[in-house]
């Protein structure tokens, strides 16, 4: 059974997309797909209970999808053509489909393990992507193939260990890095410190636990502004060691402002 948080995120996700579009229909199919739900749930079990990492399950992937599609829409509203549009091979909605698929499926590989999970995610996701795209009316084989390939680019590139080249794929790793609010760290932090000493890697959980809120909206000088609200300085670790490396590897970097706020202090501009 889905959690209230998952259902809330699904409603937010559907509101971002235009009703009647392929991307909206695809989102409806994604959130209702039993196979995807089962893989996401089990992957979260592996991540939190077996490996001691933070949330990599259905809540995380829905939040990343919201983050990515929010940034996609901001670029579109600013008149920035996505790679498929610029190359005159696809539409904005094709890009939205690819971004949606990549973000919603990017961590399926955590159901196997952490090492090379982005590659495992692509392997697991490919037949699912094909099945879902074949169910959309009005998409010919050429467009389905194009969307599939771009979605896979976003999945394999989300760890910032492989060079990616499209704006669409570049949004996935930034969107992933933006999901660092304290709620994502609370469960594994409680498990890891339940009567035990803190161990190597807990800095990620402590730093994420100091992130109060991440806001993505229209920038002042660039189309996208990411504002990270923190309760303490330790949250800077999450920004500097997780988010910024992903932004630096993203083709979408030129369009992003990054600002941090610690308590009531003035803004810290990273980008």
List the predicted regions and their residue ranges.
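Divalent metal-dependent phosphate-bond-processing catalytic cores, especially two-metal-ion Mg2+/Mn2+ enzymes
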Residues: 1-29, 52-55, 59, 66-93, ...
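Hydrophobic face of alpha-helices
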Residues: 64-65, 122
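Hydrophobic alpha-helical transmembrane segments of integral membrane proteins
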Residues: 60-61, 95, 151
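Short alpha-helical hairpin
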Residues: 25-48
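Post-HEXXH active-site segment of zinc metalloproteases
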Residues: 114-127
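Active-site alpha-helix of zinc metalloproteases
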Residues: 98-102
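A general structural signal for well-ordered alpha-helical packing
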Residues: 122, 152, 168-171
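Contiguous mid-protein beta-loop-alpha structural module that forms a pocket-lining wall or clamp
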Residues: 116, 129-164
């Amino acid at each position: 059974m889905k959690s209230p948080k998952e259902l809330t995120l699904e409603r937010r996700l559907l509101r971002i997309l235009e009703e009647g579009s392929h991307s909206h229909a695809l989102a409806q199919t994604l959130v209702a797909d039993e196979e995807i739900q089962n893989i996401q749930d089990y992957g979260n079990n592996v991540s939190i209970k077996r490996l001691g990492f933070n949330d990599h399950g259905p809540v995380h992937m829905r939040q990343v999808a919201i983050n990515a599609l929010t940034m996609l829409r901001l670029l579109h509203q600013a008149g920035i053509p996505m790679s498929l549009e610029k190359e005159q091979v696809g539409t904005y909605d094709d890009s939205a489909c690819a971004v949606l698929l990549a973000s919603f499926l990017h961590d399926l590989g955590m159901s196997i393990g952490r090492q090379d999970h982005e590659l495992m995610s692509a392997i697991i996701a490919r037949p699912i992507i094909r099945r879902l795209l074949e169910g959309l009316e009005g998409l010919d084989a050429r467009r389905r193939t194009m969307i599939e390939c771009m979605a896979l680019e976003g999945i394999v590139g989300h760890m910032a260990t492989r060079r990616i080249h499209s704006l669409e794929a570049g949004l996935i790793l930034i969107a992933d890095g933006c999901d660092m609010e304290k709620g994502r760290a609370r469960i594994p932090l409680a498990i890891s410190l339940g009567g035990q000493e803190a161990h190597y890697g807990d800095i990620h959980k402590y730093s994420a636990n100091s992130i109060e809120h991440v806001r993505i909206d229209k920038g002042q000088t660039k189309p996208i502004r990411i504002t990270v609200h923190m309760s303490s300085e330790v949250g800077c670790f999450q920004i500097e060691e997780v988010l910024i490396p992903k932004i630096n590897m993203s083709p979408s970097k030129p369009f992003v402002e990054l600002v941090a706020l610690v308590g009531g202090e003035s803004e810290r501009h990273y980008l």
